[in-house]
Structure formats: C-alpha cells, structure tokens
Amino acid sequence: MTNNVKNEAVLDSAHVGDIRGAFGTIRHGDVAARNSVWQRLRTLLAILGPGLIVMVGDNDAGAFSTYAQAGQNYGTSLLWTLILLIPVLYVNQEMVLRLGAVTGVGHARLILERFGKFWGTFSAIDLFLLNALTIVTEFIGITLGLQYLGLPKEWGVIAAAGLVMAAASTGDFRRFERFSMILVVFSLLLVPVFMMVHPPMSQIGHDLFVPGMPAGGKLSDVMLLIIGIVGTTVAPWQLFFQQSYVIDKRITPRFIKYERADLWLGIVLVLIGAVAIIGMSAALFAGKPEFGNFQDAGAVAAGLGKYHSHLAGVLFAVALIDASLIGASAVSLSTAYALADVLNMKHSLHRKPSDARAFYLVYFLLIAGAASLVLIPGVPLGLLTNAVQTLAGVLLPSASVFLLLLCNDKDVLGPWVNGRWTNLFTGLVAAVLVLLSVILTASVLWPDISSQTIVNVLVGGGIVGGIVVIAAHVVKLRRDAETGADLAEEAKPTKLYMHTWRMPPLAQLKPMALSRSNRMWMAVLRGYLVVAVIMVVYKVTQVALLGH
C-alpha cells in the first residue's frame, strides 16, 4: 500500500495515530515534557506492553521445559546463567525497540532493504519455518497442561486456538493488549507454586550469583542444557516481534525512555518465572527417584500433585497453558508482521481482518496448522521440537549480526545509532551467540559430541572471537579519530531533535555502504548458513526415514 505519512518510512498508515495502550492513551504528536511523577506514571502506563509481552512470551512452553529440566536434573546449580543473560536480553531487545520507534519499519523489511533480496528472503523464510515449529511446541505445552487438569485434549486445543485467533482479530489494538496483559498477570501463578514447595532460599541466592557446575553431571550434557537456556532466553522471534509491535503501538522516539522501562519490567518478570521453575523443580524432586530423569513439563505438574498438593499441580498446569497461549500469540504475530512487512501489505492490529486479509490469514493459518498437527496421531512431536532448536541455532547468528549492523547505520537510526561501548559489548555478545549457535547446531546433528570437543570449540572460538571483536573496535576507533567522527559523536544533538527524528522513506535512503571486512564476514555467514541448512535437512530426513 502507499505510504500516507510524509517524510517518514512508516509503511502502514494504521501505524500512525494515538497510542492506545492497555492502561492509557497518548495523543498523536504529543511531545510535551512530563514534569510531575503523576504525568510520568500515566505515560508509562500507556506505553506498557511490548516489553512485558515479549519477555513473558519468552517464558513459553519451551522455556518451561528447559528450566524444569535444569532444576530436576541439576538442582539450582545453573541459576547463575540467568543473571548473565540479563544484559544480553536488555541490549538485544533495547536495540530492536529503538529500531522500531525510530524507523517505523519492521526488522525483516529493514534487512531486505539494506542487505538485499537474498538476506531479506532468507530471514523471512527461516523465521516462518522456525516460528511455525515453535507454535507447535506451544500447543504441545497446552496439551500437557490439559492432560494434568483432566480436560479433553481435542476440545481444549480447539478452544485455545480459537481464543488466540479471536483476541487478535477484533480490529482493536487496545483489546488485544489487555488480553495479553491478563496472560502476563496469570504468569505470576508460578510464584505461589514456588512458595508452596519451600525451596532453600539461601541456596537459591548463592547459586544465582556464584557460578558453578553440577557435581557429577556430564559436561557435554550440562553445556548443551546451558546453551538451551541461552537459546530459550534469546530467541530470534523476539527481535522481529518487539520491533513490529512497537511500530504497531505507534511508539515514537519521544517515548523510547518509557519503553526501556517497560522492557526492564518484562525482564524482571521473565527472571522471576525462570527462577521459580528451576527452584521449584529442584526442591520438589530432590532426593526423589525422578531427580535427574526429566521427562516433560506435564510430569513436573504430576510430581507436584504427587509430592505436594493437587492445588500446586493445578496452578503449575494453568501457568503452563497461560505461557503457551501468550507464546503462540506472540510468535504467530511476529511471523505475520514480518511477512506482511516484506511483501508491503497492510499489517496492523488496528485493522479488522477484512481490511488486512493477508496479515490475518498468515496468523490464522499458523495457529490452525499448529493446533491440527498436535491433534494428529503419530506426528513426531519430538522431532519437531529438535528441529526448532536446530533452526533457532541456524537463524540466531544472522539475526544478531544484522541487528548490530542496522544499529550502526546512520541513515536508518540517525542520532539513535549505537555508541562505541554498546558496540563493543554487543559485538562480544554476538560472537558468543554465534559460538553457542554453532555448538547447538552441531549437538543436534551429532548427538554423541564429546565434552572435550565442546570445551575446545568454546575456548578456541572464544579466544578468536574476542580478538576479532576487540581488533575491529580498535580499528574503528582509529578510523574515527582520523576522520574526526569521534568529535562529531561528542557533539550530542538536542533532546527535541532526538525526540522528533524519524527515518526518511525507504526510497530516499542511500544504498548501504559495507566495509571490506563487513562484506567478508557476510560472505562467511552466508557460507555457514548454506552448510548448516544442508546438514539440518539431511539430519531431519535421516531421522524421519530411519529413526536415528
């Protein structure tokens, strides 16, 4: 559709107007100062939503399984990984919320416009496949919760799918966000379950802040679980979802500060949920035959009913269903947003299905397809779950690299580009994520990978990656010093300029000029992706046909 917004790159006219959040409204064009505490609180309440939804959606069915496995198999010894992931979560999601507020263009479309058709097409297709499989795992979580509650699986799955579809298709953005906020509140059911089990708080406090490895655990298994925690916590769909949702909510640069606060609240909730699941599972199964023998999240609910109380099991099952619902909703939306963005179609929750048919069709088909697969007897759900992990490992490096490059593109972000220290930290994080991605992908393709191989890859890759990132940072500092770019950076723009700067229409942007080193790394990334995809297809085909 045509862009009706002058001097801005916003692709859908529905993305411009009043901010109508679950808890308040901000009029379009309102850039007035918020001087009193009450004014700031009202503004924050209106902005609340994107950060909370994406972070609580991160604690979905897959996260329940991963965190419960960590607690049941290794106690609370891996809690420290959650603390280390806090800055990673914040930096990644802060960059995409900044991209969304400043550009008004979704993540997939920016990749297409700035890096070409290959990368744009790859990102959209890979995201679609990964998200479609992820939504299946959400409905697996729903069936596990229904099973413990004694409710019929077929009717329960159909009702869940219908609820998720209906919530997004009213043509009222505020109504969808209020539905999502209800799910966010229900995610806190994990807290009373945690308190009921009476886990050792002193041990939890120790393991949160003192890194250590489980005694007697096989290093390769522990490392793969740690990588699983990272992959669960830092998922590619989150980047695409939050950027598009910030755009759809009509958040502008004026309110980035408030959206950052929203993100921090979401991170606090995701941390509370993760600690509750790990701590509760560890205390529940300590000294029991089930310790070290994790099955699935449904078995954890059964364990609560067996060793504690039926109420605790019910609350956990309801929390699992709740997490699966918000996960299915957010992941489906991220896909529909991305495809519609790339194909230049209407894509907004402010529109009714009759006014954005393709956008809602993608959303409905993803939900209906996932629900149907779960209900079909004989579908290899375990294979689908492994495929999700593998595809996440394949997509994460490219998503991390593109995010970093886009946040250094001055034509895209203007005065909102990354600072030098943000770049250094983000570069190191991206290097670590790429390294973990390689190990995760390799572990699925070769399940018998040895502990020594993992250690060698971590140490060798960590040293090489650290040297490359630091060297690139030093080279950039020298180049900036020679060109005077560092002096320009020190002359900070005014607050009003920052609050009103938006990316110009895509057609007005100059072609992105990649340095020789950037082009080299893009070629390496393309080669890695080609090899990884071929190996994944081979492995999945082998397992499907031969069963091993």
Which role does the model predict for each range below?
Residues R351-L361, N386-L445, A481-G484:
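C-terminal membrane-solvent junction of multi-pass transporters and transport-like membrane proteins
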Residues V54, T81-R114, F122-L129, L133:
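Juxtamembrane transmembrane-helix boundary signature
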Residues A124-I125, Y148-S169, F186-L190, R357-G369, ...:
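Transmembrane alpha-helical segments of multi-pass small-molecule transport proteins
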Residues I26-A32, T66-G71, E94-W119, R174, ...:
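Flexible loop linkers connecting adjacent transmembrane helices
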Residues D221-L224, W421-A485, R526, V530-V533, ...:
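A generic transmembrane alpha-helix motif of multi-pass inner-membrane proteins
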Residues V185-M213, M223-Q243, F402-K410, L436-V444, ...:
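Hydrophobic alpha-helical segments and their helix-loop junctions in multi-pass secondary transporters
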Residues K117-F118, E154-A159, L265, L269, ...:
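Loop-to-transmembrane helix boundary motifs in multi-pass membrane proteins
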Residues V88-V102, V246-I247, V268-A299, Q542:
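Extracellular/periplasmic helix-exit of transmembrane alpha-helices
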